[in-house]
Swiss-Prot record:
Residues the entry annotates as binding Mg(2+): S18
Assigned protein family: Belongs to the shikimate kinase family.
UniProt source species: Salmonella typhimurium (strain LT2 / SGSC1412 / ATCC 700720)
Pfam families: SKI
Binding-site list for substrate: D36, R60, G82, R140
Entry-linked InterPro entries: P-loop_NTPase, Shikimate/glucono_kinase, Shikimate_kinase/TSH1, Shikimate_kinase_CS
Gene name as annotated: aroK
Note on how the cofactor is bound: Binds 1 Mg(2+) ion per subunit.
Official protein name in the record: Shikimate kinase 1
Amino acid sequence: MAEKRNIFLVGPMGAGKSTIGRQLAQQLNMEFYDSDQEIEKRTGADVGWVFDVEGEDGFRNREEKVINELTEKQGIVLATGGGSVKSRETRNRLSARGVVVYLETTIEKQLARTQRDKKRPLLQVEAPPREVLEALANERNPLYEEIADVTIRTDDQSAKVVANQIIHMLESN
């Protein structure tokens, strides 16, 4: 991979986008960004607070702006928020400005990986987490698939193994 293409990780919460993204960036000697962390940095508040105060629409507007700015950079790995693909603009920008890698996982793995995480605003509701995750999957999985250049299942693999798979797939394309 002589020239460094942007690599954008999409997928549901708990798929490993941030962990795998950091590993991938380290292995490729690229800059890593996480859209949720960028929002937190810019607002001085955590994602849950932004969600509570501004609602999902306000949060998504911030997310769209942050992703637009970040995707204009060169040679980065970006872990996007699970719902970022709801925006057609964001989907178009991701597709046009880099390689989109869809990190796929099962509802069971999502439940296991997110059960103690209080920084997941969409799971801080009355409905059972499984039902919430299933509804999100029904809405978002087709959007991830629509823009994915590469799809990798992350269920029982370490971040390093998945990062190596991504590198191998990128080198063979």
